[in-house]
Amino acid sequence: MLYQQIASNKRKTVYVMIGFAILVLFIGAAVGYVFYDSAMAGIIMAAVIAAIYMAMMIANSTNVVMGMNHATEISEADHPEIWHIVEDMALVANIPMPKVYIVNDASPNAFATGNSPKNAAVAVTTGILERLNREELEGVIGHEVSHIRNYDIRLSTIALALSSAIAMLVNIGMRSFWWGGGRRRNDNDNEGGSLEIVMMIISIVLVILGPIATTIAQLALSRNREYLADASSVELTRNPLGLIHALQKISVSEPMKEADPSSAALYISDPFKKKRTMAHLFDTHPPIEDRIQRLERM
């Protein structure tokens, strides 16, 4: 079952890559049509921006994400306990030892990033080291190592890169509008007026709703991966109580100060403790109570 899920995640990586790429091009076309009077110019601009973001994130995702979250790489001598826990969990999961980072934040939390198990990294906050015991830390690290083993981190990296590209496209379009750009037509350019209006409306709606749809899709992927990582952590530690108690402590902690908003979905729990939405569409994580209930049934 687990190996089937890993294979499924690899396929999802391809699907997400294709889907996001298509969405980027459509939004680029809409931005070009509305603000520059040329859908093709928008598509070219979108392709260039997306390619740059993808290259940056895939080639240097660990450094980029760790930098955004103010994380510092450590050695075994700096924090031997957490270092050895990461080492042990990686050994059990049969993956290379990830790099280990520390985020100087009193709120307990952790995340994993990278492009593949060969260049992955795990980050923990100072707060999680102070508040969790060894069994609870093993549950948390087992969860993060599972993200690495299941190739969730690659999916996250691609989604984050292309979401950033979409945000940049919309930003460019809006700045162009405020700086005096925008679509202009001559008074005698009235041929196909009805079609022109329809295309303009569709383009504007796409520019407005495209980033929202992207966010919803990205967060849905994140929520589904959390359940799998929880289950995989128990497979590694053989101790569901460790992760249960860790989640309980994390759920009642204060919001983080050092977390980057665009990386929120990477963390084991929402670092900003935002109020849950009615339909959970904009939640970065599934409810902790639901995760605990699933763990209790194992």
From Swiss-Prot:
The cofactor(s) it depends on are: Zn(2+)
Q: Topology relative to the membrane, per the entry?
A: Multi-pass membrane protein
Top-rank taxon:
Bacteria
Q: Which Gene3D superfamilies match?
A: Metalloproteases ('zincins'), catalytic domain (3.30.2010.10)
Q: What is the enzyme's main class? A: hydrolase
Q: Which GO terms describe its biological process?
A: proteolysis
Q: What is its EC number?
A: 3.4.24.-
For the keyword RNA-binding, the answer is no
Gene Ontology molecular function: metalloendopeptidase activity; zinc ion binding
According to the UniProt record, one GO cellular component term is: plasma membrane
* CDD domains on file: M48B_Htpx_like
Compartmental location? Cell membrane
Q: Which residues form the active site?
A: 144
Q: Which family does it belong to?
A: Belongs to the peptidase M48B family.
Q: What is this protein called?
A: Protease HtpX homolog
Organism listed in the record: Pediococcus pentosaceus (strain ATCC 25745 / CCUG 21536 / LMG 10740 / 183-1w)
Which lineage ranks, top first, belong to the organism behind this chain?
Bacteria, Bacillati, Bacillota, Bacilli, Lactobacillales
